């Protein structure tokens, strides 16, 4: 079933990877290394960022610099239309052996559907969270993939019941030990502040997320300074562009906090409490067994006119979804004053025993996921699944 100029060469295949965000770019880079372990002569092309390029991918476009969420993504329709049109022309004459879209369903489901129409195997990595919102898109997903590689334990059963070919590969966050030297806060240069009370701020990796969520985080920190003398805060940035954006907020609030890039795990381990944007970061924090407050600021009208009709899950925080209970406080959608955040943070910072109870529960929650990844990393499982699909052609 080889197409035009498609070699179907099992020893030197061509893989097309698509990552639209920083998190997907990191997953793509790790996956390239795993695929190269299976196919040393493989070629890699696709859509992604600097990390995929460094791993050896010929990057055709880098959308990670302006990635957006929900309604923000619609504003980029022209960009993606042009990119998809170019891919369609290229694949009509030179097809990759396997397409691997990574997360970002708004974009990647379109890429997957295009691949299936051209009879190119599609191995989708990181399942769209249709169990939480927009479950009616399951029909589109079912028609767009040959295999769906899920990263959360319950997803295999959910998507399997919907008729989607699914494998559970484990979550890539657990592929490396949490307490390795690279995540040790004492190893950072310059060192993090030595403060009696320590607050980590994780406002997200997208420009729109930071613009929405960092101001209430800053306001919460400023309010906590009056309750906890000597409190220090450190913000984690995905890259220098996001660090620059975060630092630009500080003069407006008269706040002095450190902003670090490439040190998120160490900052989490350093902190007593983490204020975080919703998303995968909550699982990253849980992996280190750290108490957290989770928020996502959204305009009132966006939630009431759009958001509440899309969301189907009882909880919005990934940690609470996995636990199926209110394990960590979540403030989503958040569109009011910061007093509830300040109250919740004060309660946890003033009561170490409450933080310790959360730490124990997070350890119990994440232990099975860590054990699964210890047996075989997620990237390697995805690589083996991609190889299986290719062998069927």
Residue ranges of predicted features:
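Nucleotide-activated sugar donor-binding and catalytic core shared by glycosyltransferases
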Residues: 2-393
């Amino acid at each position: 079933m080889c197409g035009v100029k498609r070699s179907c060469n099992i020893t030197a295949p061509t893989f097309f990877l698509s990552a639209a965000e920083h998190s997907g770019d990191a997953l793509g880079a790790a996956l390239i290394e795993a695929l190269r372990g299976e196919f040393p002569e493989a070629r890699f092309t696709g859509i992604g960022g600097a990390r995929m390029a460094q791993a050896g991918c010929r990057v055709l476009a880098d959308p990670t610099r302006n990635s957006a969420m929900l309604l923000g993504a619609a504003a980029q329709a022209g960009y993606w239309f042009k990119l998809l049109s170019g891919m369609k022309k290229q694949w009509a004459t030179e097809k990759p052996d396997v397409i691997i879209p990574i997360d970002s369903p708004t974009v990647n489901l379109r890429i997957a559907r295009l691949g299936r129409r051209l009879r190119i195997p599609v191995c989708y990595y990181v399942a769209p969270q249709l169990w939480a919102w927009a479950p009616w898109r399951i029909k589109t997903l079912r028609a767009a993939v040959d295999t769906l590689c899920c990263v959360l334990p319950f997803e295999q059963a959910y998507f399997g019941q919907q008729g989607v070919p699914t494998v559970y590969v484990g979550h890539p966050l657990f592929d490396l030990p949490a307490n390795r030297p690279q995540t040790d806060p004492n190893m950072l240069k310059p060192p993090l502040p030595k403060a009696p009370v320590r607050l980590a701020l994780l406002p997200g990796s997208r420009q729109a997320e930071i613009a929405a969520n960092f101001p209430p985080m800053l306001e919460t920190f400023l309010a906590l300074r009056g309750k906890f003398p000597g409190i220090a805060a450190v913000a984690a940035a995905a890259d220098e562009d996001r660090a620059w954006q975060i630092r630009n907020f500080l003069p407006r609030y008269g706040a002095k906090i450190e902003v670090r890039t490439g040190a998120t795990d160490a900052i989490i381990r350093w902190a007593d409490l983490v204020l975080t944007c919703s998303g995968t970061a909550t699982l990253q924090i849980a992996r280190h067994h750290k108490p957290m407050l989770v928020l996502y600021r959204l305009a009132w009208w966006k939630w009431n006119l759009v958001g509440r009709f899309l969301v189907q899950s009882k909880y919005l925080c990934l940690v609470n979804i996995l636990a199926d209970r209110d394990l960590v406080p979540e403030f989503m959608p958040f569109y009011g004053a910061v007093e509830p955040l300040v109250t919740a943070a004060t309660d946890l910072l003033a009561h170490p025993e409450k933080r310790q109870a959360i730490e124990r529960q997070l350890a119990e929650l994440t232990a099975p996921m860590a054990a699964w990844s210890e047996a075989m990393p997620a990237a390697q499982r995805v690589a083996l699944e991609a190889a299986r699909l290719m062998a069927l052609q």
